[in-house]
Structure formats: structure tokens, C-alpha cells
Amino acid sequence: MAAARGRGGQVGTKAKVSLGLPVGAVMNCADNSGAKNLYTIACFGIKGHLSKLPSASIGDMILCSVKKGSPKLRKKVLQAIVIRQRRPWRRRDGVFIYFEDNAGVIANPKGEMKGSQITGPVAKECADIWPKVASNAGSVV
């Protein structure tokens, strides 16, 4: 019998968003956990093809390490949720939207954030999937 595989803290279905953060991308950490930069190591749920880098988008959970920040967080493999990306994507109403930076928040596998507040806006696509992130967001765009 196969082991049951849960979806963690995700709620509902994920909207289709253009992939904007390949493996190796560095993004800002937008919470108050003590990390400054997050280096993308892997993306969850990507099967992949030969010679194609796995990429993440808004609302995806990624595996990352902290490049700048508090010594307690550095040199450890952590999980994070992408909340902003520079690459434009099209919403269902036809509007193209993008942010001025790439940003993520450190979270556990259930989607509960390590920090208690988020600096800057959070994409609506991410807030719909991750309710714990939405509750800590200052503004949802």
C-alpha cells in the first residue's frame, strides 16, 4: 500500500502562472525571520525534462538556502513560498501583472511561516493557496 501524500497547507487549486524563478535564482526574503536572500535549490512538484531547469512561480513551495542573514538560518536547507516575481503573467481577466522584485517567505511543509509579518505586497494567486501567508500579508495585490 502506498503512503498517503498530503498537500501540506495548500487550499484550493493553483492558478496557471508563468514560471519566473529557475533553480539558482536568488530572491529577497520578505518576512522578519532574519534571512535577507534566498537561493533556490529545487522546486517541489516539478517532474522535469532533460536539459530543462526546474522553475517556480507565484505560490510554489521551493527548497532554498539563506545566502545573507542571521547565522542561525545560514547554511541550512529550508523551505520557502514564492510571493512575488518579476516575470509578467496573465490573469484570467486579461491583465498582465508583475512585481519589481522576486521575493519569498520561509515556511514549514504545512505552510506555516517562520516569521510573523511580510514586507511589501503578496500576489493574490499566492494568498488564495496559502491562508497562513495571506493572514500575515500587509497587502494582497
Swiss-Prot record:
SUPFAM superfamilies on file: Ribosomal protein L14
Q: Does the keyword Amino-acid biosynthesis apply?
A: no
SMART domains in the record, alphabetically? Ribosomal_L14
Q: What superkingdom heads the lineage?
A: Eukaryota
UniProt keyword terms in alphabetical order: Ribonucleoprotein, Ribosomal protein
Q: Which PROSITE patterns match?
A: RIBOSOMAL_L14 (PS00049)
Q: Does the keyword Oxidoreductase apply?
A: no
GO MF assignments: large ribosomal subunit rRNA binding; structural constituent of ribosome
Q: Which GO terms describe its biological process?
A: translation
Query: Mind telling me which GO cellular component terms the entry cites?
Result: cytosolic large ribosomal subunit
**Family under the similarity heading:** Belongs to the universal ribosomal protein uL14 family.
Matching PANTHER family: 50S/60S RIBOSOMAL PROTEIN L14/L23, LARGE RIBOSOMAL SUBUNIT PROTEIN UL14
Q: HAMAP family this protein is in?
A: Ribosomal_uL14 (MF_01367)
Q: What is this protein called?
A: Large ribosomal subunit protein uL14
Question: What are the leading ranks of the lineage?
Answer: Eukaryota, Sar, Alveolata, Ciliophora, Intramacronucleata
Gene, per the UniProt record: RPL23
